[in-house]
Curated annotation (Swiss-Prot):
Family per record: Belongs to the tryptophan 2,3-dioxygenase family.
HAMAP family documented for this protein: T23O
Catalyses which reaction(s): L-tryptophan + O2 = N-formyl-L-kynurenine
Amino-acid positions noted as binding heme in the UniProt annotation, renumbered to this chain: 327
Entry note: cofactor: Binds 1 heme group per subunit.
Name of this protein: Tryptophan 2,3-dioxygenase B
A Pfam family this chain is assigned to: Trp_dioxygenase
EC class name: oxidoreductase
GO molecular function terms attached to this record: heme binding; metal ion binding; tryptophan 2,3-dioxygenase activity
Pathway: Amino-acid degradation; L-tryptophan degradation via kynurenine pathway; L-kynurenine from L-tryptophan: step 1/2
Protein function: Heme-dependent dioxygenase that catalyzes the oxidative cleavage of the L-tryptophan (L-Trp) pyrrole ring and converts L-tryptophan to N-formyl-L-kynurenine. Catalyzes the oxidative cleavage of the indole moiety.
Cofactor: heme
Length: 407
């Protein structure tokens, strides 16, 4: 018999007794609580405001352009996600500022919130693909209605850069002016106020400086590492010098000399200060030591969560660079080499911001330069081997073993 294959016993809901069939259907066993009053979905999310915030300038001017709606919604979505990133970032900074990270059990909270920021940034990087469904000609149709509005005027993105720790003196000037000059009134005051607060970079730096095991009168990681590396390089050079004179021997000696120069510079505090003044390093000398120690001992229980944090911070830098790059590519595709709607050089200005000048945790990336064979890494003493909340008691950089209340 031909007909619908679903007209079998499973459709007994359409039987002569619909009430009985409904009672037997488990999917209908809930209760409609909305009928009893209280806040409902649209009110909770204030959708009347959100969904009515798309005002097309082309329509206001009597020439409604379809793709302007996509342009507005996409940028509003960016701003909402920026707001969430700032929410997470401020909470992490607060945990550091109030010294809750001295109780290392709170570090998992820090890592998970930083990880959430990276997940949001991944979404923001991918979101450009939606905007790129619009062609350059589609954008041209309504671009004239945008001026002098510009993405550079995004207060939240400037706050995000500032709070993470983008160095003010390394920023590329915007039309030969300080970036803050593009903001006025309350927005300018908000930026000024934010600049007085410690950045995530500064807070992480202070935390790294307290890494257990850096104390010269304790484990003295740095001193032991320097001695081990110098001895290791000396042994390697001795082995190479015993080889027959060949091109391979010469190459190995040149490589060893470069390594020696690299590590001589690493253990030279004055050299580090010089690189700091040039903006080539961002962390203090002691903080760099802490970061390298965490990398070497990342498999130890004490250092596993700190290593996850350093990895997540590098991921933020990576994703922000990808975001800038995708933005540059999109702008180049949409307007070519034209000036931006806000008056900047457009593509050329944006391209100049895709560099290490805007990387906050560049020192963490450069740690790979200083990796050595595991046999050269100093062996940990039993105290540092202990789990986080017990090891804190043996760490002279902490004043006590008491935990503090956390948010």
């Amino acid at each position: 018999m031909s007909g619908c294959p679903f007209l079998g016993g499973t459709l007994q809901l359409l039987s002569s007794n619909p009430r009985q069939a409904e009672e037997e259907d488990g999917s209908q066993g809930g209760v409609n609580k909305a009928a009893k009053g209280g806040i409902i979905y649209g009110d909770y999310l204030q959708l009347d405001k959100v969904l009515n915030a798309q005002v097309l300038q082309s329509e206001q001017k009597g020439n409604k352009i379809h793709d302007e709606h996509l342009f507005i919604v996409t940028h509003q979505a960016y701003e909402l996600w920026f707001k969430q990133i700032l929410w997470e970032l401020d909470s992490v900074r607060d945990l550091f500022i109030k010294k809750h990270v001295r109780d290392e059990r709170n570090m998992l909270k820090v890592v998970s919130r930083i990880h959430r920021i990276t997940m949001i940034f991944k979404l923001l990087v991918d979101q450009f693909a939606v905007l790129e469904t619009m062609t350059a000609l589609d954008f041209f149709d309504f671009r004239e209605y945008l001026s002098p509005a510009s993405g550079f005027q995004s207060l939240q993105f400037r706050l995000l850069e500032q709070k993470i720790g983008v160095a003010d003196h390394l920023r590329v000037p915007y039309n030969r002016r300080h970036y803050r000059d593009n903001f006025h009134g309350e927005e300018s005051e908000t930026l000024l106020s934010s600049e007085q607060e410690p950045t995530l970079l500064q807070l992480v730096e202070q935390w790294l400086e307290r890494t257990p095991g850096l104390e010269k009168d304790g484990f003295n990681f740095w001193g032991k590492l320097q001695a081990n590396i110098e001895e290791g390089l000396k042994r390697e050079k001795h082995q190479v010098e015993k080889m027959e004179d060949t091109e391979v021997k010469q190459e190995l000696l040149e490589d060893l000399n470069k390594q020696m120069e690299t590590f001589t510079a690493l253990f030279d505090s004055k050299r580090h200060e010089h690189l700091l003044s040039k903006g080539e390093r961002r962390l203090s000398y002691k903080a760099l030591q802490g970061a390298l120690m965490i990398n070497f001992y990342r498999e130890e229980p004490r250092f596993q969560v700190p290593f996850q944090l350093l990895t997540a911070l590098m991921e933020i830098d990576t994703l922000m660079t990808k975001w800038r790059y995708n933005h540059v590519c999109m702008v180049h595709r949409m307007i070519g080499s034209k000036a931006g709607t806000g008056g900047s050089s457009g593509y050329h200005y944006l391209r100049s911001t895709v560099s290490d000048r805007y990387k906050v945790f560049v020192d963490l990336f450069n740690l790979a330069t200083f990796l050595v064979p595991r046999s050269w890494v100093p062996k940990l003493n039993p105290n540092i081997h202990k789990f986080p909340y017990t090891a804190e008691c043996y760490d002279s950089s902490y004043n006590s073993c008491s935990s503090e209340d956390s948010d």
